[in-house]
Amino acid sequence: MARFNDDPAGGLGLILVERQHGYQTSDIEKMGLNSQSTAQVVFQDVRVPKTNMMVAPGEAMKALFISLAGSRPLVSLMALGVAQAALDESIRYAQDRSQFGKPIAGHQLISAKLGEMATKIEAGKLLALQALSQVDRGERSDVSAAMSKWFGTQMACEVVGEALQIHGGNGITKEYPVEYMYRAVRPFMVTEGTNEIQKLSIGRALTGIDAFG
C-alpha cells in the first residue's frame, strides 16, 4: 500500500513491488505469532512500473476493509485454537494434580473455572462463524468481523490466563505448555487492528458518529 497524494484515505493505492536494488528487509523478533515472519521493509530509490498498480489510488481502503472482514474472524479462531489447547491442558492437569486428598478438578473453584473457560471459547467460535457465514453469502460483515475479532481474542487471552492460574507455579515454568501459550495468544489482540479499534468500529456502526479522532 502506498500514498499517491495527501488525501488521508483517497490517496492510497496498492502496488506490486518486485525485489530489486534498493529493496531491503530486516527481521523483527516477536513474543508470539512466530509461524509468520515480521520484518521492516526499506525501499531506497526503487522504481515501480505503472503496470504493477494492483488497486488504483482511492480504492485501496475499500479493498483493505473487504480483506479485513474475512481475516479478522480467522484471527479470532486462531486465538481460540490456542485457548482450546490451554483448556485441554488444564483439564488434564486438573484431573491429575491432587490437593487435600483429591484431584483439583474436584474443587469448586477449579471446576467453575473450567466451565467458564469452555463457554467463552464456544461463544467466540460462534461469533466468528457468524461473521464468516456473512462473508460467504456476500453480505456486509465489517461489524460482525470487528465483534468477532475483539470478543474472540479477548476471551482467548482470558482463557489462557485462567489456564496458567490453574497450573499455579507450574504454569510459569517452561516445563508446561501453558507458559508458551500465554505468550502466543497475546499478540492476537493487536494484529489485524487492535481490539480498541474494533470497539470504535462497532460504536460508529451503532451511533453513526465517528469517534476515531
Residue ranges of model-derived segments:
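Flexible, small-/acidic-enriched active-site or ligand-binding loops
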Residues: 18-47
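Active-site PLP-lysine loop of aminotransferase-like
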Residues: 4, 32-33, 72, 149
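Short beta-strand-to-turn element immediately C-terminal to the catalytic PLP-Schiff-base lysine
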Residues: 1-3, 16-18, 42-44, 55, ...
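Solvent-exposed alpha-helices and their adjacent loops that cap or buttress functional pockets
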Residues: 5-9, 16, 32-35, 56-57, ...
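Alpha-helical interface subdomain recognition
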Residues: 40-42, 59, 66-213
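A short core secondary-structure module
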Residues: 1-26
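Short coil/turn connectors at secondary-structure junctions
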Residues: 9-12, 37-38, 50
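Long, acidic (Asp/Glu-rich), low-complexity accessory segments flanking structured domains
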Residues: 44-63
